[in-house]
Amino acid sequence: AGALGESGASLSIVNSLDVLRNRLLLEIARKKAKEGANRNRQILLSL
């Protein structure tokens, strides 16, 4: 039972790390998308 409890704890730690990483990746993707949109707008305005 002790070993099971330990693996469960490490599993939850891994899960929270995954959640954090996914949130970070989403944030980066959102920033890139916003920057890309701004760049496209500037290109259109400069034509």
UniProtKB/Swiss-Prot annotation:
The keyword Nucleotidyltransferase does not apply. PROSITE patterns: CRF. GO terms for molecular function: hormone activity. One of its GO terms (cellular component) is extracellular region. Its main location: secreted. It is found in: Secreted. It comes from the Eukaryota. Keywords: Hormone, Secreted. InterPro entries: Corticotropin-releasing_fac_CS, CRF. Stimulates fluid secretion by the Malpighian tubules. Increases cyclic AMP production in Malpighian tubules. Belongs to the sauvagine/corticotropin-releasing factor/urotensin I family. This is Diuretic hormone 2.
